[in-house]
């Protein structure tokens, strides 16, 4: 009888201990999951936005979004543990006029760095150079008005000589002129070492392949890295 009582006490103690332990472990695991989720959200919230505003070259037309040069730059940023989040606002076929019309909508978030890549489609369509330059200036003005602390990187472009030597030359000069006037960082030529190289472009001969996009990323990174490392 005594042995039976001892066994019963042992059984009750074991059951009570077991029943009390499971909820604690469950709560502990839930707390850990919540903490991890909050930490991830906090890290995202703490990251400053780099907004890439451009054409199909920025959007990565014909490729997976992760192969576009802004995404490649995000990988470079992450490898250095820099607190920045890339937002790709590239749009295929975008002109400076189109960019001017949508800039206010795009700037509905706080932007630390604004990378402006527009003008190529204007040049290919023969848009008057004064109009292209005016539209780019208007976009720059809006960015500065929204937040004077936003750093702006202007991406230079060149076009084939189809429109004539004078037009081509003046088009090229738009970007350094605007960069100097507004004290912006300038990427001299986005398609450097990619434009006109068959194996680095898709069949249309205009849009870079994934390998070409990596070179574009390097071209931009040379200018962008010092800006976000300060």
Feature-to-residue mapping (PLM):
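N-terminal secretory targeting modules
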Residues: 1-53, 59-64, 78-83, 109, ...
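A generic secondary-structure micro-motif detector
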Residues: 2-5, 63, 92, 129, ...
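A short beta-strand-loop structural module common to alpha/beta enzyme folds
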Residues: 82-95
